[in-house]
Amino acid sequence: MKKSLLGLTFASLMFSAGSAVAADYKIDKEGQHAFVNFRIQHLGYSWLYGTFKDFDGTFTFDEKNPAADKVNVTINTTSVDTNHAERDKHLRSADFLNTAKYPQATFTSTSVKKDGDELDITGDLTLNGVTKPVTLEAKLIGQGDDPWGGKRAGFEAEGKIKLKDFNIKTDLGPASQEVDLIISVEGVQQK
């Protein structure tokens, strides 16, 4: 009886220790603590910045075991906003995002590796009907308790994509072939 009680206690401690380490988070879209931004050079003379205003996602974060981390994000591509209505309409057209045919973009991580202070998050990005691997360099900004009794974790990530890789063939000149992704998310831990 003592052995089985000891075994049960040990097993429950192992289970609690493991579950306390990995945590699932929902991106805080409602509180506006998350941003999916981008920039591209305009003719090589300046940077044009934009954002996607409507997206949702989740992530699993285990600080001690990055290989267990996961990220899943869905972006409503019709929500693209560059602070210029005519340009946004053009970006939604078949020349760029083709939102009538592909109203969503998705990112699903396939691996997460620690690289010094950063995490290299590699995953499949589906955009404009094309799926390609993309690596984002992410950094933990902070984590801990919030004033409402919950727990939060925040990250910033950056990456690059080439327009032609996602079947976007509009030629904006040699300086405008790549898009920089600048992402900031805060997640609320799920219970």
Curated annotation (Swiss-Prot):
Its main location: periplasm. SMART domains: YceI (SM00867). Residues 1-22 form the signal peptide. It holds the Pfam family YceI. SUPFAM superfamilies: YceI-like. GO terms for cellular component: extracellular space; periplasmic space. It is found in: Periplasm. It comes from the Bacteria. Keywords: Periplasm, Signal. Disulfide bonds: none annotated. Belongs to the UPF0312 family. Type 1 subfamily. This is Protein YceI. It comes from Escherichia coli (strain K12).
